[in-house]
Amino acid sequence: MKKLVIKSAIYFFFILLVLEVIVRIFHLGKDTPARFLDSYEVEKWKPNQNGFSVTGNRRQNFSEYHINSSGYNSYREFTPTKDKIEVALVGDSFIEGFHQNYYNSIGKKIETKIPKIEVYEYGYAGYDFADQLHLVHSYKKQFDLIDHVILGIKFSNDLTRGEYNIMRGRLDLESPINKLLKKSKLLVYCKSIGVLDPPQELIYRIRKTLRPQQKDAAIDKNEALRIQQENEKKYLENFKSLVSKYNYDKKRFTLLLDSRITNSTFLSYLKKNNFTYIDFATSFEASKKSTTLIYDRHWNNHGRNLIAKTIIEHLTTIKIFR
């Protein structure tokens, strides 16, 4: 019996080893760059990293990323000067672009059409409006040299707070245990395709059983509407607070948004108070092709082409070219 257990353990180990090799050879497990908090308390990726972002159990999306010396996914370094024309794209994972090869990003698409300018992409998954303005404020000397800054914003989740503070949730992913676990591509792959979901759910249920909580009372439609209206009011106040605190430059800054999913009161406020914004809703609605990936709502290559085109039209309108 003892020999059987030992042999089984050895076979199991070798099976795991073979699977680990297969996952690595075929790049089934994604590479996740390390993140950190810099001296300005700006959360970003550690500079000078390369790897591949993989999504789906059949490698539905496979793209290469390159973290530059500034800590962002881009094919170029950020070196603004008074002698060049630069545009900054600031935002979350949609700007970060891990779903597309870094050398075929939105910024690169814009530069291909307008060789006169350099586009700097300050994209980081999870950035909200507070993160973005804190970044711009922290690197003021750099951003003051950039001719135009475009900030991506989604009303429903980018304005949930009215001031910047460090969000430890993402940084906790850099704990020693998580770093150790990420060294196994097999484990990373299993987690990405949901193999580890059942045991995690079992642990959650056991904890819930041991610590019974009161059930939340059902919310009727009127109450849900009231909560929604309160949140929308709060988000608008948060926006006002942030643009005031960080001295938002209306002449040089432009918001990038989708009016289809943006609160009408917020849009009215932007127009009334002369906040410039780029609305890509029309181009997306008119598109006969899908603008998003199959497995999530991030823009696909066609969607990114439309975003780049919309930004180019805006830059042409404001006559950024000298």
Spans of features found by a protein language model:
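Histidine-centered active-site loop/cap adjacent to the catalytic His
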Residues: 5, 295-322
